[in-house]
Amino acid sequence: VRIGNGRIGAMVFGGIEEETIALNESSMWSGQYDENQEIPFGKERMNELRKFFFEGKIQEGNQIAGEFLHGNGHSFGTHLPIGDLKLTFSYPENTVSNYRRSLDLGTAISTTNYTIGDVNYVRECFATNPDDVLVLRMSASKKKAINAKLSLSMLRESEISTDGNQLIFEGTVNFPKQGPGGVSFQ
């Protein structure tokens, strides 16, 4: 299930023993500015092109368009995902039942529900626009029933550290196939 607020996005896979949340953020771009991409076409050329097409001179119009309406072969980069947040859960040996995933279109909350033995588990994930954060809320019908290990698998060159209760990752969005460069992030 995909969720997001226009800047932060995630794909919630909804597993029971392992939950994967693929993370995304709008500024994660590889590449760099390339002034050679800006080939001026000009108002005169556009008028000439329109004239050819309106007169039915398609071949001549295509010649002008093919010659002037494209960038050069340099790549300016691409948008790339951040990485995967993984939660690995430990449960007492028992039967899983009542598994259900949903996305409430009114609240934009992705929910995963299931029961193991006599314990009901609920995971809710959403991205708020006013607070500009991604939230994962986990609950269980019995106290101390949630036992999970957290890991972050970064798809970019990065370092991960902690500061109090914050997980910090910083690095560079580099994708050699798309050329040099990329934004730095924290």
Where do the language-model regions lie?
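Aromatic-residue-lined binding/catalytic grooves and analogous aromatic/hydrophobic interfacial grooves
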Residues: V1-Q186
